[in-house]
Amino acid sequence: GTGMICELGHTSIDWNGIPCDCGNRGCLEKYISSDIIERRLMEATGDGKPFAAFCSEMEDALVKKEKGMEWTEREKKMDVIFSDMTEKLACGLISFCNSFNPQRVIIGHEGWWIPDYYLLQAEEILNCRQIFRKYRKIPIVKAFFGTESTRIGCTGALLTAIFNGGLI
């Protein structure tokens, strides 16, 4: 092996989609990266805050809805964007899981901020459509190290290469 981790962001969800820097078309990150979702949320709300803050606001809105309270127009617009993101994420995960048959999907980096509600929806869609659905369920979990998971994972991969004599 190369010691490289999987790059889910470059799983194509549209063969004729938006050109990606990797050379492919329709890569997931061109539709649902935190930067893309943040920009869509900014356009929908007129608010210029970071992705994590929008996720926190949506988490609060979901609690509000759970208590039977009505959503504001702003919250409804945000839900449309998060729900669209969920569908696209599930689409990419279905292709990924059908190809690699992982034990679980771990969401880290900026994805760690995504409200659990939407990750549970993505997990439900994944497990209704993935090829192994009759035999097992693939959970979607948040990375233990949260937003630092990418940095820690890269450090671990580098240290593994050093200790295995690959870089010395």
Model-derived regions: residue spans:
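Immediate flanking context of iron-sulfur cluster ligation sites
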Residues: 5-21
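ATP-binding/phosphotransfer module of carbohydrate and carboxylate kinases, centering on a glycine-rich
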Residues: 15-19, 28-168
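Short Cys/His-rich Zn2+-coordinating modules
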Residues: 2-6, 77
